[in-house]
């Protein structure tokens, strides 16, 4: 809907229209070829007759104001001799009395003058003009018989910047035949001729943009040379136009005049001297829209299209700053409300303010001119907490506790892995000990680790005060501290009627999908809890959308509707089947919002300079160790993935390919491990995912009499800490054979300095957590991390997928890890079209999977032998390395593929 025009705008438009008509009339006259002086004189009488009709005043006695004349009669010939003009070249009655006498003397005139169209010129007149060509008398007679032209308007001419002349007017030219008779003053007139129009002329125009002007024209080699000769030249490769400073305007126009093949229309608001005229420019009616975005804790940026009105508004702000790199303006937060209020007064500008969530989070910056530093958080009084715990806190850990207390015990503690989130969470919970009982929800593999941590750091607690729920029949409120796993929490919903005021959620990224059972069970608890402490080393495992549940758990009033969050931070797109929230946008603003109101995150590089950096290396294992039969199985599995199948069948084919990769890499992995032992490596970790690979590694270490431990999904939680201590205190060659998914959290192996990944995993967060089993507090050596990659396997597609996901985390400030920058030999990508197709399937399967744990369960329970029927031949392919029944050790389970991506219909439970 267009905006209504104001009275001033209508007046300006009407003035500009009149000026345009005048310029158009002058242009039409200029385009007509000039004839000789006598020819112009011959046509002049007819023109003068018409002009005399137009300039005669209406008869006073006629109410309609129309004049009447006889058809075909010459008005000058019918006038009395006394009234005919002689000395003056033109005639017009000057008074009402003279006009009345004139009309009375012409009483026989009967035809009315219908319109001011030009009269026709007879052939006799044209012949007469030719016969008198070049004679002064003919010109004088013509000039003497010409009546006075239209009365001129000196004010209009002054506005137009053109001098007033006594010759023919613009309207005179427009309504005549486009010819102009020069003033002779009794002397012979020279013939005026114009050069013929250029046959092939390149036409263009100049357009004003602020203090510069640009030229819109096609390509011309000579013109380009002229452009390059001007010092203020600037070429825009995107629009393919040249622009210059106004100081070069005159030089450009003079140079273009010398080019015979170029015609350039000048600027309308600039005269021949290069300066501006007094013509007022019409107001800009272009409607522009924009929005505000946060770029720091103190400043915000405006993303909006170009408009002179907007620029004028920006220049009214005292804190304005223009960034030439981004070509955007930014201001202090304290001027946000002022800018928005003034923008609403402009009808052609729509500027969206910062979301209400941001204005609430940064309320102090919006009201104050001074910015409060994050380091100004007051130190909390921890005198009521056990002295042993307080004395063991590092300075940055004590700052984390103070930050949490300043947020009233509601935060997402997202410190990097290995920085002691557990001890900080226990200290925060102990500060609110009067509000206990305490509920601690953790992954099942670290339940007993948390029990030992409470007994270690809080001597005031007795073992009877801690209740670890082991089965679904256990009591959730039996102790002062109650520890339960995510899976058991969903089975104890009936016992959740008694609210907990203090809740700790370890690895809170497990709650990334509201559709899962564990999330539905945890959300009601967090809703009624007074203190909520979320712990996560990787708060956004894959996509910013996965942060939403954690944000509303800490701040229920932030983004009550997920759609608003998705539009701003997930690059939400509407597709035929619904909204897609899998993207990411405004990650910098999201990071600032989280750090200000929800999240505290410190990286190892920020707080522990003595902690050695990780040194990653991608090792391409010898493909010759892969047997021919294994290669054939891989090729067959890859071929099955490229066929047109349903989504369920594609995921099953993907799992087959994933399992075949583990089987094919067994000889290569074992060879690499034996080489490490022979080279003098004493203690290191080996991570794998498939049971067939873990079994093969453990069997080979037993055959070589190498001391080792093994922790996988079948290892009881109570035994894992003992195995970890056994490895830490061991001497000599010791290898820890670990499952990527079962031993990637809650365990410390800081006595080792090398981690070997025999397999890759699609989720980079899981890989980073596994790395940090060694890269933890207490580590004094440089940590080496080796990723074993085999060409022609699933590694071809998993490695670039990991790099892409870790890049998104880095942009959001949620990971300091960059596989591309910190890993040696990263140029390992798919090459042929078939590989690209398979990579797309990997990417779609793992990104569309709303819950990695559901897909992980399907991968763990997938029985390769029941699908391929080749378990009996596997031992022959692998020689002495594998057991005959290695592929059939896992009990068959029901395959499950559950995906939860229906974010568009989700509304915050708060």
From Swiss-Prot:
Residues 1-170, 865-890 are annotated as: Disordered. SMART domains: DEXDc (SM00487), HELICc (SM00490). ATP binds at residues 415-422. Residues 865-875 have a biased composition (Low complexity). Keywords: Acetylation, Coiled coil, Hydrolase, Nucleus, Phosphoprotein, Repeat. A motif (DESH box) lies at residues 506-509. InterPro entries: HARP_dom (IPR010003), Helicase_ATP-bd (IPR014001), Helicase_C-like (IPR001650), P-loop_NTPase (IPR027417), SNF2-like_sf (IPR038718), SNF2/RAD54-like_C (IPR049730), SNF2_N (IPR000330). Its EC number is 3.6.4.-. Residues 672-825 form the Helicase C-terminal domain. Residues 2-30, 5-30 are annotated as: Mediates interaction with RPA2. The modification Phosphoserine is found at residues 117, 164. Pfam families: HARP (PF07443), Helicase_C (PF00271), SNF2-rel_dom (PF00176). Residues 198-268, 284-355 form the HARP domain. A motif (Nuclear localization signal) lies at residues 601-618. It is found in: Nucleus. It catalyses: ATP + H2O = ADP + phosphate + H(+). Residues 3-28 form a coiled coil. The modification N-acetylserine is found at residue 2. Residues 402-557 form the Helicase ATP-binding domain. Residues 7-29, 97-107, 150-160 have a biased composition (Basic and acidic residues). Its main location: nucleus. GO terms for biological process: DNA damage response; DNA repair; double-strand break repair via nonhomologous end joining; regulation of transcription by RNA polymerase II; replication fork processing. SUPFAM superfamilies: P-loop containing nucleoside triphosphate hydrolases. Belongs to the SNF2/RAD54 helicase family. SMARCAL1 subfamily. Interacts with RPA2; the interaction is direct and mediates the recruitment by the RPA complex of SMARCAL1 to sites of DNA damage. This is SWI/SNF-related matrix-associated actin-dependent regulator of chromatin subfamily A-like protein 1. It comes from Rattus norvegicus (Rat).
